[in-house]
Amino acid sequence: MTPRYVLAIDQGTTSSRAILFDRAGDIVGSAQREFAQIFPQPGWVEHDPREILTSVYATLTELLSREQIDPRHIAALGITNQRETTVVWDRATGQPIHNAIVWQSRQSHAICERLKCDGHEARVRERTGLLIDAYFSATKVRWILDHVEGAQQRAERGELLFGTIDSWLVWNLSGGQAHVTDYSNAARTLLFNIHTLDWDDDLLALLDIPRAMLPQVRDSSTVYAHTRPQFFFDHPIPIAGIAGDQQAALFGQACFLPGMVKNTYGTGCFMLMHTGTQAVRSRNGLLTTIAWGLDGRVEYALEGSIFIAGSVVQWLRDGLRMIERASDSQALAAQVPDSGGAYLVPAFVGLGAPYWRSDVRGAMFGLTRGTRKAHFVRAALEAMAYQTRDVLDAMQSDAGIALTELRADGGAIGNDFLAGFQADILGVPLLRPRLTETTALGAAYLAGLAVGFWSSREQIAAQWGLDRRFEPQMEVARREKLYAGWQQAVAATLAFHVD
């Protein structure tokens, strides 16, 4: 039976989705399930790995049932995932020994500070392309081994496995056939040497993490395993593509040439520049990371990671109850000509690139008696654009490339106000693709390439379609005045920090 579709699992920070794509790269159907966010202490964020699995299984079942898809028509399954989020589970039982520690969580901050104080940052940066920060997986693993009784000894005996969410999903979907990850996810652990393309024994020794816990690292487009018999009506489907969410979006945006840049506006905000086969070291607080491994060759990227972006709208809705629906933010922001001088710095769990300060917290500046709800909401949306400008300026400096356009995706960029303001504050056109679900599309493309469903990257690039081009309309003087106000607000936020 001729395959017609590729299935993608997009396992995100707040929900899991299953999306089915046809050969043209169009969405045939999708399903989504949210799951609980666990906040044991301020600054800590956890997920129940079993609930993540349940949410994934539910979306797969719902999608195939509702669309009445014959599983024999599915060529392959691709996985994209929230990166850095860490799961440790029992090799024999498959049960996690602790909640997953989410990428946003700061609970391993003290471990990071010790590593910095002991002078390890330069070595870690040189080998991994990353900074020592609680954002990445390594210190999360160390925290779990320290806080679960007997975990260190069990890990040393080979009884425990570590993985990012992709590894956890493949292990379970395949019935334990494969303990694997891909280069893009491995590069986010703070344990992987991006130059030798292997787990770094010195870094493992530094954190006392047994190598036996770690997954095998493979290309981002290859057959890792097949789904276990009880899935998909006893028809095994090849699991053939894996990429961390931001690298998957870069692939889905067809940013295949050095210098091409995309920004994903999701829970966080993430800008990636493709740098080809060269690992460009940042001098401005950006990360050097692996974009993907394809056809036996690794390609690199520069990344600026912003911790809080679209989730600020969720905070307006659920925390402050200023809006009933996330979509209400666009209409409210449009009610006022500007933010009334208000700036929101959403450092709820610290500031990411290019500042990397985990000890600061969110702040609001410029409030007056005339500040209304619309000003507050507008300031929250504008904060996403200002943070992106911070990263873009650093990226241009590192790469020596003046950008001519930005390809944007993710749920928040469907907000026309945000898209237009982003183009204004950057001073370059923002291109929103016809299909904004580029993260899942990238995972589908990687899986489809592995099994011959798509023939080449050239075919994929030809399928990229434009929905709308947002040209900058703001005068340069006004743009720079607004941005200077943002920089002043950030400086004040950095001056007020917590222990």
Curated annotation (Swiss-Prot):
Pathway membership: Polyol metabolism; glycerol degradation via glycerol kinase pathway; sn-glycerol 3-phosphate from glycerol: step 1/1
Sequence positions that bind sn-glycerol 3-phosphate: T13, R83, E84, Y135, D245
Binding site for ATP: T13, T14, S15, T267, G310, Q314, G411
Source organism superkingdom: Bacteria
Keyword list, A-Z: ATP-binding, Glycerol metabolism, Kinase, Nucleotide-binding, Transferase
Residues reported to bind ADP: T13, R17, T267, G310, G411, N415
Protein family membership: Belongs to the FGGY kinase family.
Free-text function comment from the UniProt entry: Key enzyme in the regulation of glycerol uptake and metabolism. Catalyzes the phosphorylation of glycerol to yield sn-glycerol 3-phosphate.
Protein name: Glycerol kinase
Organism of this sequence: Stenotrophomonas maltophilia (strain K279a)
Phylogenetic lineage: Bacteria, Pseudomonadati, Pseudomonadota, Gammaproteobacteria, Lysobacterales
